Amino acid sequence: MNCDPDVTECVTFPAVSPDNQLTRAFMQLSHYRFSIAWPRLMPDGTKASLNQKGLDHYNKVINALLAAGVTPMATLYHWDLPQTLQDKGGWPNPELADLFNDYARVCFKEFGDRVRTLTSC
């Protein structure tokens, strides 16, 4: 499995469409929580590296859930810090608070119209 930031195969469910068997199974759920991978949206952890393929992927996931009548709930951080930020010291680095704020704002802007619950671990 290729888990590069611009590849969508490394995900909870590999193909999202109304015909997908897993998507149909979600119809029995009222809510579904999934993680948005910071490295997928911003591979180097900054707005400058915003990855359109990553945005498209999560829009597809969210739209498929909504089409199935399932309320999406997204976790913004679930232990997947971009490697470049880990290399700069990880969370103890004071710059990370501002970078996470930028990432969270992008998520709210891009997905907040459809995802009403965004959390972090």
In which residue ranges do the predicted regions lie?
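Short catalytic helix/loop segments, enriched in acidic residues and glycine
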Residues: 1, 9-19
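Substrate-binding cleft and catalytic face of glycoside hydrolase catalytic domains
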Residues: 2-5, 22-121
